[in-house]
């Protein structure tokens, strides 16, 4: 990997804000050690790149809005960051596991569109979105959902969602 970085000038994030993998383990970080080329646009669609967008949230920064959390959760699905998805899911509705690695066929995520975001009050919000994906070699499909979010202790959490037809 070091040779790839020297040749291509790419910066890779491995342990995120925790520093080296050893420092991450000492700090109690239990997430997967994922890597992504920071020159690549963020999976949520932001051309600024993963390290300046959803990567910051995946590394522990709190989302400023429910829509920002929604985008980071979409990116986590793309990157199979089950650790982040579960950590950003409200404790009252969080499943024990998502089993993303066992999904067959695994979805190929094609894009995210935030249709509407509405602040209910200071600590509750609703985000309507469409996520496009493909299963195996099949045709593209859409997941159109209205999701509810709650903020506790300054952090937004996904509560639940309602699929739309």
Description of each model-found segment:
Residues 4, 10-15, 141-165:
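Short beta-strand edge/turn micro-motifs at domain boundaries
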Residues 38-48:
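Short Cys/His-rich zinc-binding micro-motifs
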Residues 52-54:
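Cysteine-centered loop/knuckle micro-motif
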Residues 56-65:
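Short Cys/His-rich micro-motifs in 6-15 aa windows
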Residues 64-80:
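Short, aromatic-enriched amphipathic alpha-helices that serve as compact interaction elements
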Residues 87-114:
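Short solvent-exposed beta->alpha transition segments
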Residues 104-142:
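Surface-exposed, charged secondary-structure patches
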């Amino acid at each position: 990997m070091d040779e790839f970085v020297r040749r291509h000038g790419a910066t890779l994030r491995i342990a995120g804000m925790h520093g080296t993998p050893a420092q991450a383990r000492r700090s109690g970080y239990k997430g997967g050690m994922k890597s992504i080329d920071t020159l690549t646009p963020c999976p949520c669609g932001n051309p600024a790149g993963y390290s300046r967008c959803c990567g910051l949230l995946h590394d522990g920064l709190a989302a400023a809005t429910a829509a920002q959390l929604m985008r980071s959760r979409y990116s986590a699905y793309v990157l199979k960051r089950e650790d982040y998805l579960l950590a950003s899911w409200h404790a009252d509705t969080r499943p024990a596991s998502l089993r993303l690695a066992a999904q067959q066929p695994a979805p190929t995520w094609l894009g995210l569109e935030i249709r509407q975001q509405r602040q209910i009050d200071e600590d509750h919000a609703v985000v309507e979105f469409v996520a496009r994906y493909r299963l195996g070699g099949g045709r593209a499909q859409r997941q159109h959902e209205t999701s509810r979010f709650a903020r506790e202790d300054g952090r937004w959490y996904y509560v639940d969602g309602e699929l739309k037809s």
